[in-house]
């Protein structure tokens, strides 16, 4: 299937024959990306490209999160899912199982008794997996920092990618943390720890 337009031959994709009234040429015929693809297709008959950009784009637009709500910060995390903020419009949807989740949001005071459960849930998540630490208690122990039963930050148990400060942080702060995580994934393709 080919279409001849002047001196150039268009191989793929098949043109719909829509002509731009301003220029008199086929729409898309002056697109540099379109010409590069057509040149490679007409030369070899197939296209060789990297799927990294596509995978990174899909990964940032479909982050599935799992709640690990331990204390009062979990209320703000729930508020983030309500219609006023609607975090699903950013491609950030909740999942109940760690095996279907990409992101774990640790919200609240992590105790020594709960730490092995946190690690077990983290280990059940598929790669690549990300962790958002939400609130002062999850970040560094918070108000209960000097208690004998409190872990002084969930980063001692699992690697943390984004820290959201506050006691409790607002839903806007969590949304900002989600957007920062997406930006980091877009910039690097993954997050180096």
UniProtKB/Swiss-Prot annotation:
Record has RNA-binding as a keyword: no
Keyword annotations of the record: 4Fe-4S, Cell inner membrane, Cell membrane, Iron, Iron-sulfur, Membrane, Metal-binding, NAD, Quinone, Translocase, Transport, Ubiquinone
An example Gene Ontology molecular-function term: 4 iron, 4 sulfur cluster binding
GO BP terms: aerobic respiration; electron transport coupled proton transport
Cofactor(s) essential for the protein: [4Fe-4S] cluster
Record note on cofactor: Binds 1 [4Fe-4S] cluster.
Membrane topology per record: Peripheral membrane protein
Gene: nuoB
PROSITE patterns, sorted: COMPLEX1_20K (PS01150)
E.C. no: 7.1.1.-
Subunit structure: NDH-1 is composed of 14 different subunits. Subunits NuoB, C, D, E, F, and G constitute the peripheral sector of the complex.
SUPFAM superfamilies hit by this protein: HydA/Nqo6-like
Protein name: NADH-quinone oxidoreductase subunit B
